[in-house]
Amino acid sequence: MKKQLGFLIIALFFVHTLFADLTINIIQGVNKPYPIAVVPFGNDVKNAWQVPNGVSGIIAQDLTNSGRFANLPVSQMPATPTDVINFNWQQWNNANTGIEYAVVGNITPGTVPNTYTVTFSLLSLLSNQPLIGQQFSNVPRDQLRLLGHQISDVIYQTITGKPGYFRTRLAYVEVFNSTTAKGTWELVVSDYDGFNPHVLLKQSAEPIASPNWSPDGSTLAYVSYINNRQAIFTISLTTGQRHIIANFPGTNSAPAFSPDGQSMAMALSGSDTTDASDIYVMNLKTRQLTRYTDFGSNTSPNWSPDGKTLVFNSDRGGSPQIYSLDLASKSATRLSYTGVNNYDPVFTPDGKNLIIMTQQTAGGPIQLASLNLASNAINIITSGQLDKSPSVAPNGDMIVYANYDSAHGILAETTLDGTVQIKLPATDGTVQSPAWSPFLN
């Protein structure tokens, strides 16, 4: 199968690339990962910055990062074929490696100068036949890493049945010297694995918080300050242009784009004498506001996938708990009953679960948990002392969050059942408020 690879190159204005990348360490994996051999590609192109271990190395790392694949070391491979024709099925089956899948590929010069043609095949040793084969023509050298992620997505979906997330991105805030007059806040966008981080916005003395992706991945909403008052902004990833969305008296916080991108939920305070925050929805075209709560302090709204419901946390019952809000009727229903405090709900893409922050005992750790919407059962996912700001990958397989067990906050990732734990250590400042992008074209 021939396939021309189309690339979207996003130009980030007024940004610079960080010199130190986040690194990933898997500290726990699933019990039965898929055994796979990613055979080194023929004539693989290696570059110390972009693809230090070649395109095949990117694929192997992606699959390992997911925790759902067990990669066979090259030293244990019975051979290193680069295409299906030279793959000796009997030799691999007799090697007793336990491998169920193999990936082979080859790279040749493209027909356009300084480009490459990349072919790969995914083979099943369960059925002794190829599952998929693709060719990508005239790939620029600086896009080989992206191509590796694209191939990983294909392999992931073919084997697991779910879309891969390796071409998605993370937005987060990195904070330096926040307790001093020289404190700076940076709004950063990186690849899903922390590689290729770019600073989209840098500010001194004006904190940045709560980044939230538009559904098309072109824009981030975030919270910062105007004249010492919290306000909600948007910033374009292609132009760097910023817009003020909400700068009402009181505080303006917790922005959340609706699934169709036409509205934004937010928490606003100062609308009455109590100064308690309430949930509002703004029509982004007309800027019309609709208020949905009026009792207790309410914040952290998040949309259901169908856009008909908001979940949020409220202290109306005496302690922070999770509630759902039907937008048509404006009626709210409490969802969480287990634990002392529950915060920051986010939907999984299938709409069946919420990922929340939970504190099960007074003075106990704050960890991530899943809340099943059918049973209201809560299942603890993480084991940190302070785990915050969960955000779910668009395929629903992974969660990114901020972990504060060390002196500096770091990013971490986990599966929904907690069987895969990945830490992405910060290289310098404290990392906080991660947000996982939607699928990107």
Where are the regions a protein language model picked out?
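A flexible loop/linker signature enriched in serine peptidases of the S9 family
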Residues: 163, 175-186, 203-205, 223-232, ...
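Blade-level signature of beta-propeller repeat domains, shared across WD40, Kelch, NHL, RCC1
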Residues: 412-441
